């Protein structure tokens, strides 16, 4: 992978699909060799998908990013978006409820503690002023599994 020029292009969407669409369209027109997008905001890949389809580049441009199954389903199923990355909010919620229960019960929260959900069986503790509990439960949606999720 290489940058398309010596400066990193700004495609900040400010969480707006229309802005992501306009930025993606600008980048695609200015850089015909552009091979892919990755979106960090939840709406980025929607705008990128719209621009890619409009310009007839779905077979040339790969799109991967953050989103939800219901918002991205059409684009994933038609092949415009290659993968959607996220966390299952239900699993994360159950894990955090288990963590809250353990804290309230006075249990010691230590490295490797099991919070009873896939990806949270052996969490990592990040020490510091804002102590964090980190799980490892990415959910990668593609044409094979996107219909398994409805949110």
Q: In which residue ranges do the predicted regions lie?
A:
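A residue-level marker of the well-folded mature domains of exported/periplasmic proteins
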Residues: 1-151
């Amino acid at each position: 992978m290489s940058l398309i020029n010596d400066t990193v292009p700004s495609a900040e969407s400010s969480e707006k699909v229309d802005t992501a669409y306009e930025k993606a369209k600008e980048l695609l027109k200015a850089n015909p060799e552009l091979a892919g997008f990755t979106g960090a905001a939840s709406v980025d890949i929607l705008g990128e998908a719209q621009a890619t389809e409009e310009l007839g580049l779905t077979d040339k441009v790969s799109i991967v990013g953050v989103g939800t199954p219901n918002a991205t389903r059409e684009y994933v199923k038609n092949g415009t978006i290659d993968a959607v990355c996220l966390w299952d909010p239900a699993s994360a919620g159950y894990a955090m409820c288990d963590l809250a229960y353990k804290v309230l019960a006075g249990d010691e929260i230590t490295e490797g503690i099991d919070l009873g959900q896939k990806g949270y069986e052996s969490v990592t503790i990040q020490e510091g002023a804002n102590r964090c509990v980190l799980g490892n439960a990415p959910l990668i949606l593609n044409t094979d599994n996107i219909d398994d999720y409805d949110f």
